[in-house]
A protein has these predicted regions:
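Peripheral, non-transmembrane regulatory/ligand-interaction domains of membrane transport proteins
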Residues: 1-174
Length: 175
């Protein structure tokens, strides 16, 4: 982190924010840096669906991302699986990250839906506590996802209203 602070001038406390798994989604301006914090879906060590923070920092010379773990949202960019992304078009790049994030939520929601249906079928047959507990875990995940998606929506709306970030005509297709 010290190298990133030295190279970009981003405050160390701002860089550490997404390393706190309780950090909330928001957008802030700190000097010349626009900070976008959003929640992304993830699986925890017990294979439960949770959300974790992703920090995106836009400075004049760079875009920096910070997350508690390696994420498929960013991996797609690193592996050149996203067409027409350019880091010099910073706002568009952020919109593409947010779009990928929304796609990840949809993928996880489809998985949760399938698992819920399977558990419900088992529950009709067995009527055991194990299936009820599994169903409750999935319900909890849905609450996390719903809360995070609402927060992410607020961040996106604020980002669209922010005049400090340059927007491109082709951004409309992502939105």
């Amino acid at each position: 982190l010290q190298t990133v602070v030295r190279e970009t001038g981003i405050d160390i406390d701002d860089l550490r924010a997404p390393l706190d798994d309780e950090e909330r989604s928001r957008i802030e301006q700190e000097g010349d840096c626009v900070i976008v914090l959003v929640d992304i879906p993830s699986l925890d060590e017990k294979d439960r669906y949770v959300t974790i923070p992703l920090g995106i920092y836009m400075t004049k010379q760079a875009i920096v991302t910070v997350c508690l773990e390696e994420t498929p949202v960013l991996k797609a960019f690193m592996n050149n699986r996203v067409r027409e992304f350019y880091t010099f078009k910073k706002t568009r790049f952020v919109f593409q990250i947010l779009y990928r994030n929304a796609t990840s939520y949809l993928r996880y929601l489809r998985i949760i839906d399938r698992k819920s249906e399977q558990i419900e079928e088992k529950l009709h047959i067995s009527q055991k506590n194990k299936e009820l507990i599994e169903l409750l875990e999935l319900e909890k995940s849905l609450v996390y996802f719903t809360t995070s998606l609402r927060s992410n929506e607020t961040v996106l709306e604020k980002l669209l209203r922010t005049e400090k970030v340059k927007k491109y005509p082709e951004d409309d297709e992502l939105l």
